[in-house]
């Protein structure tokens, strides 16, 4: 769910997920279209593509369990879809952390209409 995703992003990056990534670039947040603006935005693009592969669970509402051991996210689910959902969220959180050095505040509240046609996954 959005709750676990936000918690993972906070744990990995130390940033407030809604404020820092809620409207970042063309892909972070609700909508997604156009060319990713930078590496951080590309993380969100890949994350949206990961969600598109999920079948049988709701990425916004369905809760899953994970643990934070030695600063590492460990997904712990028996349900295959929820496990995959957790892995999608884990991957974006790690990607965002790995690209903190290129995070650009000018894309924090990027206007989505400036993002042109969709990039296919």
From Swiss-Prot:
The record places the site described as Cationic membrane-docking site (MDoS) at 112, 117
From the UniProt entry, list the residue stretches annotated as the region Important for membrane-damaging activities in eukaryotes and bacteria: 105-117
Q: Which InterPro entries match?
A: PLipase_A2, PLipase_A2_Asp_AS, PLipase_A2_dom, PLipase_A2_dom_sf, PLipase_A2_His_AS
From the record, give the cysteines joined by S-S bonds. 26-115, 28-44, 43-95, 49-121, 50-88, 57-81, 75-86
For this protein, what is any one GO molecular function term? calcium ion binding
Record's keyword terms, sorted: Disulfide bond, Myotoxin, Secreted, Toxin
Q: Which GO terms describe its cellular component?
A: extracellular region
| One BP term from GO | arachidonate secretion
Q: Where found?
A: Secreted
Expression across tissues: Expressed by the venom gland.
Q: Where is this site: Hydrophobic membrane-disruption site (MDiS)?
A: 111
| Sites annotated Important residue of the cationic membrane-docking site (MDoS) | 105, 108
Q: What is this protein's function per UniProt?
A: Snake venom phospholipase A2 homolog that lacks enzymatic activity. Is myotoxic and displays edema-inducing activities in mouse paw. Also displays cytotoxic activity against myotubes. A model of myotoxic mechanism has been proposed: an apo Lys49-PLA2 is activated by the entrance of a hydrophobic molecule (e.g. fatty acid) at the hydrophobic channel of the protein leading to a reorientation of a monomer.
Assigned protein family: Belongs to the phospholipase A2 family. Group II subfamily. K49 sub-subfamily.
Q: How does this chain assemble?
A: Homodimer; non-covalently linked (probable alternative/compact dimer conformation in solution).
| Name recorded for this polypeptide | Basic phospholipase A2 homolog 2
Organism from which the protein derives: Bothrops brazili (Brazil's lancehead)
